[in-house]
């Protein structure tokens, strides 16, 4: 798995997978995308946009932040999943927070390889 492929697996869900509610969405997606074993990932953000539109942030769709980091010019639909306090694997229960914000990502070779934060 390349760094770009890992970025896609962990952070891109487009079109957004259906779930009865946002908490169920996070619980299902975190498991489905392999982020609950061997340990539960504490927090993770899914971007509901195509890989191509996110990749534009690495070029004309973004502005340099620091190092390899770039800030998106446009806002994206996001779902941020946060592990509920004191939870242990394998039952990683997540809280969910939906928002529309700009994103800060790291790019290498013109491809996104790391999600830094929403801004």
Curated annotation (Swiss-Prot):
It is found in: Secreted. One of its GO terms (biological process) is defense response to Gram-positive bacterium. It is an enzyme of class 4 (lyase). Its main location: secreted. SUPFAM superfamilies: RNase A-like (SSF54076). GO terms for cellular component: extracellular region. InterPro entries: RNaseA, RNaseA-like_dom_sf, RNaseA_AS, RNaseA_domain. It catalyses: an [RNA] containing cytidine + H2O = an [RNA]-3'-cytidine-3'-phosphate + a 5'-hydroxy-ribonucleotide-3'-[RNA]; an [RNA] containing uridine + H2O = an [RNA]-3'-uridine-3'-phosphate + a 5'-hydroxy-ribonucleotide-3'-[RNA]. Keywords: Disulfide bond, Endonuclease, Hydrolase, Lyase, Nuclease, Secreted. The keyword Secreted applies. Substrate binds at residues 6, 9, 41-45, 82. It comes from the Eukaryota. The active site is at 11 (proton acceptor), 114 (proton donor). Pancreas. Its EC number is 4.6.1.18. The keyword Secreted applies. Gene3D superfamilies: Ribonuclease A-like domain (3.10.130.10). Disulfide bonds join 26-81, 40-92, 58-107. Pfam families: RnaseA (PF00074). GO terms for molecular function: lyase activity; nucleic acid binding; ribonuclease A activity. Monomer. Interacts with and forms tight 1:1 complexes with RNH1. Dimerization of two such complexes may occur. Interaction with RNH1 inhibits this protein. Endonuclease that catalyzes the cleavage of RNA on the 3' side of pyrimidine nucleotides. Acts on single-stranded and double-stranded RNA. Belongs to the pancreatic ribonuclease family. PANTHER family: ANGIOGENIN-RELATED, RIBONUCLEASE. This is Ribonuclease. It comes from Chelydra serpentina. The lineage of its organism: Eukaryota, Metazoa, Chordata, Craniata, Vertebrata.
């Amino acid at each position: 798995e390349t760094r770009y492929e890992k970025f896609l697996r962990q952070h891109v869900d487009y079109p957004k997978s259906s779930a009865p509610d946002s908490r169920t969405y996070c619980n299902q997606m975190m498991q489905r995308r392999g982020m609950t074993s061997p340990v539960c990932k504490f927090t993770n953000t899914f971007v509901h946009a195509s890989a191509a539109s996110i990749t534009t942030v690495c070029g004309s769709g973004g502005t340099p932040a620091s190092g390899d980091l770039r800030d998106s010019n446009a806002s994206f639909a996001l779902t941020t999943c946060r592990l509920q306090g004191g939870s242990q694997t394998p039952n990683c229960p997540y809280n969910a927070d939906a928002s529309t914000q700009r994103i800060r990502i790291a790019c290498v070779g013109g491809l996104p390889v790391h999600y830094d934060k929403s801004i």
